[in-house]
């Protein structure tokens, strides 16, 4: 009985390792080349394979960023966490007039995407289960309101 238990443990461990390893793909050259062109001074780069795209977290000029690229190297989004004190007055004004003004601000991010100029994402929470990502343009207009975890 003990032998079967030990063999089962080894089999599960071996299978688990193979499954975890199978999820990792090599980052395509198309992705890394576009990344290097866009962020030539990036340091502390860490890549994540998110199956439908690739995400890199890195430091550039002392600031922490995350960026996503499609599988073929198309730039999708860049985000950088900032302090809420660095939000433009127009965004603060727009947020303070909105329905989530009394919710707790959890995180503020500068967001850049190919289709948008610079935007500002404010993640707010009413409680542990009720959280929203609010995307504002530079004029302080709410562009997107998404439920988040």
Task: Give residue ranges: language-model regions.
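Interaction-mediating elements
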Residues: 23-149
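Bacterial Sec-dependent N-terminal signal peptides
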Residues: 1-26, 35
